Each structure stands twice: as C-alpha cells, then as structure tokens.
C-alpha cells in the first residue's frame, strides 16, 4: 500500500465523519443556482457521468445537487430481465463480493470478514434465517445511477436503523478497514419474498448525506441506538424491478438470502460490473415449494 493510501485510511479515522457528512449534505441540498449548477457540472465532468440516459440531461434541470445525484433515467434505459425465475440486479455498480455466509460470517475482502448478526443490527433471531445462506455486496461508484430497486417481489416486514461510523466504502477502504459494513451507519430492510426472507442493507459512508426509502423518506434519526420499525402485512409491497430507496451521495448495498433459496449467476465475482435489471441469480425454491414438500 502506498504512502498516499495509508494517509487516506488514517485521515478517515481522524476526520469528524458525521459533522463532515452533515456539512456536505447541506451543500448538496443548496438550491442557489450558482452553487448547485457549478457543483453538478464539475461532478459530471470529474466522474464522466453519462447524462444521455438521464431523464433530465441538463444541470439547470435539477433543484439541487441531491436531486441530480438521485436522478431518474429515461424509460427503457434499464430493462428488467423478463424471466421471473431469475433475481435481478438492484443497482448499477460493481460486485464487491458474493458467496456463501459461512458460520455466520460475510466475506468483505482478503483477510477481513464481518458478522451477519452485527450487520443486521445485533439481533440473532433476525439473522437466523440467513445463516448458511448467500450474500452479495455491490458498491455504487460516484458516476452510477443511485436509486435502489427490488431484485424480487417483496413485502416489507421490518426496517432497522443502525448507528455507526461513516468510513468511505470505496475498494481501498474495504480492503483495509476490518468489518467495515458492520461498523458504518446503515438501514436494514427485511422483506418477505416468494423465496423466503431477504435482507437489503443500505450502508452509509463518508459524505453520504442520507439514505431514503420510498415508504419512510429520508432515514436520519440522529440516534445513537438501534431503532426498529415494523410493518403490517400488505402495508408496503414492492414489485420486482421497482424502486425501494436511494442514496443521497452513494454507497453500498448488501443483500442476504436463505440457504438453498437461490444461486448466483455463473461468473458473478468480485469486481464484476453490474447494471440494474440484469440477471443476478436463479431462484431455486419458493416458500410455496417448501410448504408442499413438508406436506408430502
């Protein structure tokens, strides 16, 4: 690791992460035309953002930087895989890791794993269905589309806000900060789906102003304790491919599935680029199938 990389990692330990993120968040919400237009145009050029696929292609079309960052795409820009026996990729990004959850641990990077229980807020009962199951972690780079969609039909059961640090989640930090995704502030969403329970964890990061969901808006309790919100059956139902949330300044999504419920598509591994709507994996069994097997 270079000296610059070491200094970058060290600076994150020393930086007042939440104060910096709040300050950047206020700037990103500024509606002053000169500020927001300058910021947006610089960002487009700096990260080579493809505005040809954006529904609104000009910086002047957006009310603030966050409005631009969570921009909508043109119809048809991300077709959803037509085979409903396949899970679809929920975001644009790159796979950080994907594989099995072994002994309650999720692989982060060489030499680093983290606890499934801690990721999901410290509740063993909540994590139990996913032990021995499958996980995938997808990193969204600054230039990516930052809305998050459903990989399968789901009915929201619980949302958990977990306070924590706000380290960067770029590949360099992921490789060098232990248990990163179980240390950063995050929003955990537990869904009931045709293949059983599914968790989608939206991980906050340095200068991520906030995380939003379609049912709760901005999730920013400013709490130092874990907070859980439960939902009645049918209260929040989201179809495969529909939006479920978004990052106001990007981050990472961690998904978990039960053992034997699905299989990742062939070739899905670290650093694989992915796009919303693409084939992510095959559904191997549904809750209905399991129930039928029990009654036979």
Swiss-Prot record:
Gene Ontology molecular function, alphabetical: phosphatidylserine decarboxylase activity
Cofactor needs: pyruvate
Active site: 92, 149, 251
Membrane association type: Peripheral membrane protein
GO biological process, one term: phosphatidylethanolamine biosynthetic process
Cell location: Cell membrane
Any Gene Ontology CC annotation: plasma membrane
Cofactor binding notes: Binds 1 pyruvoyl group covalently per subunit.
Catalytic activity: a 1,2-diacyl-sn-glycero-3-phospho-L-serine + H(+) = a 1,2-diacyl-sn-glycero-3-phosphoethanolamine + CO2
Stored InterPro entries: PS_Dcarbxylase, PSD-B, PSD_type1_pro
Similarity comment: family membership: Belongs to the phosphatidylserine decarboxylase family. PSD-B subfamily. Prokaryotic type I sub-subfamily.
This protein's name: Phosphatidylserine decarboxylase proenzyme
Organism, scientific name: Hahella chejuensis (strain KCTC 2396)
Gene responsible for this protein: psd
